[in-house]
Amino acid sequence: LSNMTNILRQRLKSGQSLDDILPDALATAREAVFRVHHIFAYKVQLIGAIVAHEGDFAEMCTGEGKTLVVVLVSYLNALLQRGVHIVTVNEYLVQRDAKFCAESLNPLGITVGYNLSNFDANQKRKMFACDITYTTNSELGFDYLRDNMVSRYEDKVIPELNYAIVDEADSVLIDEARTPLIISGQPKQDLSMFVEVDDFVKTLGKSDYKIDPESNGI
């Protein structure tokens, strides 16, 4: 089973598409999850994975195995080696689901990382270099904004935006979308002028200026 990832990637290199290898890829991921967690993906999870792969919305009730669906479809798209981002609503779910996914797919040679708000740029770069990266929607948004502010390409933390799965899509894309992501900071400017003005002011005596008490002007 551990060699299936190489076999499937060779099929992609030979010209086959993800749709061509979908049955074998989902079967491989399903068996990997079963061997590690003793959880067997049923038809509803397989259908959910196919729906998500095709870029559609999949509405699943609590207990229908969304976490498992994400692992299945993530494995399929990770075979392209262009990055898969799993977007969810809080950092607890990010770490919990990333652990489940890593335990399931690491034996297949798939790397899994997670992105947290307290990570520095080097840590984020390492996590986004994984085949699959779990992140919150807000942190992914801020990382994208910061990447568009860097002066060197190698300073970016997100190498490519290829494929993403959005958990709780109604909350992320509708409710939380009302709150804009804003990055603010001190404007870049030449501070030498302020030093010169400060030096000049220090040379003034009381006879050199008058203060208007009404307007508080000079």
Question: Where is each model-derived feature located?
Answer:
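Conserved P-loop NTPase motor core
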Residues: 1-218
